[in-house]
From Swiss-Prot:
Compartment(s) where it occurs, according to its Swiss-Prot or TrEMBL record: Cytoplasm
Residues at which substrate binds: T158, K185, T196, E275, N399, S404
Biochemical pathway: Amino-acid biosynthesis; L-arginine biosynthesis; L-ornithine and N-acetyl-L-glutamate from L-glutamate and N(2)-acetyl-L-ornithine (cyclic): step 1/1; Amino-acid biosynthesis; L-arginine biosynthesis; N(2)-acetyl-L-ornithine from L-glutamate: step 1/4
Protein name: Arginine biosynthesis bifunctional protein ArgJ
Taxonomic lineage of the native organism: Bacteria, Pseudomonadati, Campylobacterota, Epsilonproteobacteria, Campylobacterales
Organism: Helicobacter hepaticus (strain ATCC 51449 / 3B1)
Gene name, Swiss-Prot/TrEMBL: argJ
Site keyed Cleavage: positions: A195, T196
Enzyme nomenclature, EC number: 2.3.1.35, 2.3.1.1
Gene3D superfamilies (UniProt xref): ArgJ beta chain, C-terminal domain (3.10.20.340), L-amino peptidase D-ALA esterase/amidase (3.60.70.12)
GO cellular component: cytoplasm
GO molecular function per UniProt: glutamate N-acetyltransferase activity; L-glutamate N-acetyltransferase activity
Amino acid sequence: MFEIIPIKGGVNAPQGFYADGVSAGLKPPLPNGAPALDVAFLYSEDVLKPFTLFTSNRFQAAPITHFKHFIKGKESNFVLINTKNANAMTGERGVQDVCDILSSLTQKFPFIQNPIMSSTGVIGQYLPKEKIIASFASFDFNAKCENAHTRAADAIRTTDAFSKEIALRVRLDNGESFCIGAMAKGAGMIQPALATMLCFITTDALVPQNEGDRILRECAKTSFNAISVDGDMSTNDSVFLFANGRSGVYNEAAFKEALKMIMHKLATDMVRDGEGSTKLVAFEVCGARDESQAICAAKALTNSLLVKTAIYGEDPNWGRIASTIGASGVECNEESLRIAFDSVVVFDRGQICFDEENEARAAAVMEQESFRITCDLGIGEGHFVAYGCDLGYRYIDINADYRS
C-alpha cells in the first residue's frame, strides 16, 4: 500500500531539479508595463535519459526534429522552452536555429549537456534567436527561489488563462517516499493523440530505464490522449519525464498511480482552460463492443461542434449525442442505447425519457461547470472516458486574432 500527498513546488519538488522563467521580450509587456515571462528552463543536476512522447502530426516542429536527430538516446540535463513561436514549418533553417541557440547556451554554461529545446506558439515564423540567446543572461541556477517553479509554469503559457502545475509525494508503507512534479501548458489546438500541449514531469523515483516509456504511454492513454478542446492537433506536442532516482525508491504501482493522477489533473486543466470554454465535460462511453469502439465514440462526442455548442447553451439536446454516436462508425442501435446527464436518464433502450421534468433536471446538470454525459451502448464491455468542453464566442475571438 501507499499514500499520495499533494505538496508544493511543481517541477522543483523532487530532489535535484530546478526550473525558472524569464523574459526575452517575445511577448508584449503586461498591462502594468512589466515584462511578460516567455522563456523557461528546466535544469537537472544529474544527466539522464528522458522518457518522451511526441505529437503524431506529420509536420513535426523543428525542436522535435532536432531531438530525434541529435538528442534521442543520449543523456541530457537541460530543457529550454520558449513561447510565442512554435518554430514549426520552418524547414532546415528551423532546425539550424535550434542548433545555434543551444550551442550558445552550452558555450555560456559548459555544465549543460545535450540540451533539449521545446517551443510553442505561432506556426510558420522563424525564431527570434537573438532575443532568446540574450535571455540567457537572466538565468540563475544558484538562486533556488521558492517561487521559481511558478515563474516557469507561467513562462510556458500561450493563450492559457492560468498556469498548470502540480506536485505529489508518494509514501510507501515502509516509510520511504519519492516525489513527482509537473508543469504543462495547453488551451487551444487540443485534440486526442497528445493534444496541443507541452508537459514536463520530474521525479526522484528510481524508475527503471526499460519501464518509463511504457508507463508514460499507459498514463497518457487516459489523460493527454483522452482530451479535446477543438479537434486540432498541434505540430509541437511533447511530454518529457525526467527521473533521476535520487530518492532510491521505486514501486511501480505507486509510481504509476501518482503519475496517472498528475497527468489526469493537467489534462483536465487544459480542457477546463480551453480557449473560451466554460464547461468541463466527461464523455463516458460504456457497453461498447470493445475498448477501441468506446474510444472512437467518446472522442467523436468531444469533437462534435453541435454537441459542444449545445453544452455552451446548456441545452440537453440528447438527439445530437445520439446522432454523433451513430455517425462515429461504432456498432450501436436504438434498442440498446442509454443516455444520461449525470444521473438524469433522457433515453433508455429505445424509450424517450425526456418529459418536462427530466428536461429541466438535465438542463440543471448542464448549468454546472463540470458534469458527465454517459452513453451506454449496451452491446459489450468496452469502456472509455474522454474529456471535452463547450464551444462559445470567446474561442472565435481568441483564434481570429491569435497572431496579433
